[in-house]
């Protein structure tokens, strides 16, 4: 799999805004576009891609199977639905969005879609190390990517060790921590950036890239798109990277804590309960 290290994410981008945003991102030079079934904006992504005039083989589209489709039959159907929504012949990378429900069954559906040429690579998202080991042990086609929350305050120092051993690429969601903890005003990051004439956001993205982490920052503003991708003309020193590492905060509560019972059960009730004759799972 040849996947760009830098991409554009459309999480929480309104469907009516998605085509414009993706078109602008493609025009600026982005070639990896990350969407998901639950985002409700696959159609906008596909429309922008198909109208771009860029050869389809030069654009890398990633989407994700949502928890309500986590068994073989529903996952199989949902892959076809995503292909139709995107209006493309294949999806470059399909991920399981969460390690919930019958994800082994959904994974088998992705493997079959891979063999049929509907998807060109398989991955997972939000799989903690023990779940990643589990799915790799069961997989006929190993996952290429694990997309997990990764940012200065939650740097995932342990997870990459497992990913590296399994040959799974590390992709970050929420590289800017969704703006929490005053991240864009962080004095440590600002001081690093000042040495290179770069912003806090650019320092974050550059640091992650230097750790071989794929990044997919989201913005709906053209100038911020340009700013985000302008990170290939400088390199952080070992000292900079050591300072960046000190920002990792064990006390930081993950944006979405997959080990929190109330969080997980609430998500399943909201997004899956309606799919199961209205009966709540918890």
Placement of each model-derived feature along the sequence:
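A short, structured active-site edge motif that brings together acidic residues
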Residues: 56-69, 92-99, 126-129
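Short, acidic/polar
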Residues: 13-26, 70-86, 105, 130-133, ...
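CE4/NodB-like, metal-dependent polysaccharide N-deacetylase domain
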Residues: 1, 75-95, 112-116
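N-terminal binding-site loop/beta-alpha segment at the start of enzyme catalytic domains
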Residues: 1-59, 176, 272, 277-282
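Acidic (Asp/Glu)-rich catalytic clusters
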Residues: 26, 46-58, 80-87, 112-114, ...
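A structural motif
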Residues: 30, 88-91, 119, 143
């Amino acid at each position: 799999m040849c996947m760009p290290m830098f991409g554009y994410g459309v999480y929480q981008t309104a469907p009516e805004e998605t085509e414009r945003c993706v078109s602008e991102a493609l025009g600026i030079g982005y070639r990896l576009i990350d969407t998901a079934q639950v985002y409700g904006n696959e159609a906008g992504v596909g429309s922008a891609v198909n109208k771009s005039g860029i050869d389809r083989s030069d654009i890398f589209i990633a989407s994700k199977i949502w928890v309500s489709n986590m068994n073989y039959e529903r996952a199989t159907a949902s892959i076809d639905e995503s292909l139709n929504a995107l209006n493309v012949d294949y999806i470059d990378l399909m991920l399981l969005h969460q390690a919930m429900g019958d994800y082994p069954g959904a994974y088998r559906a992705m493997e079959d879609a891979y063999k049929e040429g509907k998807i060109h690579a398989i991955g997972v998202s939000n799989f903690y190390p023990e779940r990643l080991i589990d799915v790799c042990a069961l997989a006929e086609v190993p996952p290429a990517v694990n997309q997990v929350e990764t940012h200065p305050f939650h740097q995932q120092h342990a997870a990459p060790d497992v990913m590296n051993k399994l040959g799974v690429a590390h992709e970050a969601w929420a590289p800017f921590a969704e703006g929490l903890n005053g991240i864009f005003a962080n004095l440590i990051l600002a001081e690093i950036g000042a040495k290179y004439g770069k912003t806090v956001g650019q320092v974050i993205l550059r640091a992650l890239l230097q750790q071989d982490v794929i990044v997919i920052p989201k913005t709906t503003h053209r100038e911020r798109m340009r700013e985000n991708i302008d990170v290939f003309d400088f390199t952080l020193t070992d000292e900079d990277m050591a300072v960046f590492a000190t920002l990792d905060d064990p006390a930081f509560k993950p944006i979405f804590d997959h080990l929190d019972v109330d969080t997980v059960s609430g998500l399943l009730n909201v997004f899956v309960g309606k799919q199961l004759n209205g009966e709540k799972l918890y």
